[in-house]
């Protein structure tokens, strides 16, 4: 399950007065089974970089492959890619949207084709795995503390059983 970037460049708002070069000629290979950390200053492009891993952002130039296939190839199944390469956003508010926690965590598995009942099994396992208490499953995710929101966001991705898990600032705002 390797991810490889070759000469990846990304520019926000190209050709405008707001043009920003976020990534320039990035070459990176992440072999199967590896744990890696990407560090850098605020605004250095870390979040932009990882959003390329599951095709949330298309590079301005360069290629990205997953298991040897170009993820921007004409016939490539990016929906399947996003099921295999799970991304937890830096800010959980960018990820949470349902009326209650359990429904929010069920969204991904249901989007993958599971029934509501099957999705609930996966969601409950994921929520328990991140230490989220069952008594809070019916709460609105927007009523939770920052740390609880982060746990729900992580559970939402874990419930999809991705082969690769990408965490953007995973410990920021976690409650003890």
Where are these regions (language model features)?
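The feature captures the beta-strand-to-loop junction immediately N-terminal to the Walker
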Residues: 39-41
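Catalytic Walker B motif of ABC-type/P-loop ATPase nucleotide-binding domains
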Residues: 165-168
